[in-house]
Amino acid sequence: MAPSKSIKSVVICVLILGLVLEQVQVEGKSCCKDTLARNCYNTCHFAGGSRPVCAGACRCKIISGPKCPSDYPKLNLLPESGEPDVTQYCTIGCRNSVCDNMDNVFRGQEMKFDMGLCSNACARFCNDGAVIQSVEA
């Protein structure tokens, strides 16, 4: 009975990490000419405008790949954002949303081992699995 709970915990962890990875990859999908264009795009999109409409109105492009063209250097991340901060928040968020929920469901010595594995998986995911775009052109 205990091994099946452990397997369920790992499967849930992997599924939720997959969802988190999808959200992380969405971050750099719009590229803008400059900071003014980026601010315009963010304001438009926050106000409810669709991504294509906001991109067209604000001199931005919607891209499908991970890197912006050289003439559209500004990504969705703020200029003062840095990879260490993003990695730290990713790890904290992953542990809080995935590992803490597992701890609430199952209790016991085996769960402590699973929590350690979950924390390690979050750290590996946030350090290696996430694609962080540079904000410098």
Curated annotation (Swiss-Prot):
Tell me which InterPro entries the record gives. Answer: Thionin, Thionin-like_sf
Q: Where in the cell is it found?
A: Secreted
Q: Provide a GO CC annotation, any one.
A: extracellular region
Biological process GO annotation list? defense response
Q: Alphabetically list the UniProt keywords.
A: Disulfide bond, Plant defense, Secreted, Signal, Toxin
Q: Does the keyword Secreted apply?
A: yes
For the keyword Membrane, the answer is: no
Please list the disulfide bridges: 31-68, 32-60, 40-58, 44-54
Range of residues in the leader sequence? 1-28
Name the principal localization, coarsely classed: secreted
List the Gene3D superfamilies: Thionin-like
Q: Which residues form the propeptide?
A: 75-137
Q: Name one GO molecular function term.
A: toxin activity
Where exactly are the transmembrane stretches of this chain? Answer: none
At the top level, the lineage of the source is Eukaryota
Entry function: Thionins are small plant proteins which are toxic to animal cells. They seem to exert their toxic effect at the level of the cell membrane. Their precise function is not known.
Sequence similarity: Belongs to the plant thionin (TC 1.C.44) family. 4 C-C subfamily.
Q: What name does UniProt use for this protein?
A: Leaf-specific thionin DB4
Record organism: Hordeum vulgare
